[in-house]
Amino acid sequence: MLADGHDVSCVDEDPESHARLEVGLESSWEDEGGQFTVGTGLEIDALTTAGIERADVFVASTNGDNTNIVIAQIAQRRFRVETVIARILDPYRAEWYATQGLQTICPTRTAIEMLETSVREIAAGREEGS
């Protein structure tokens, strides 16, 4: 996203996670225009330092569905971010929150769909070869 000219800011409680952001970059995250803030998405100060008040898009992508839901609601309701996306691993929860107006991405559902497609393609290939 940085390469496309977007301003990108990341909040993470693990300062070491900063190194993962630089994979594939020719220079440092900051030199490429990124901003990194140590903290959690539940900390208003960390979100403010990261620039949430200027954000057009906000993505909540922690390791916990409940945390992502709460952080996404903070971004929507308190900071009025126009587009908020929450990564939700539980397909049922992702679907329910989507019906409540929260934009969700469910990697579990995506993986299931990819597996189903692969199995169907393999099965179709076997039927053709019979």
Description of each model-found segment:
Residues M1-S130:
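Cytosolic regulatory regions of ion transport systems
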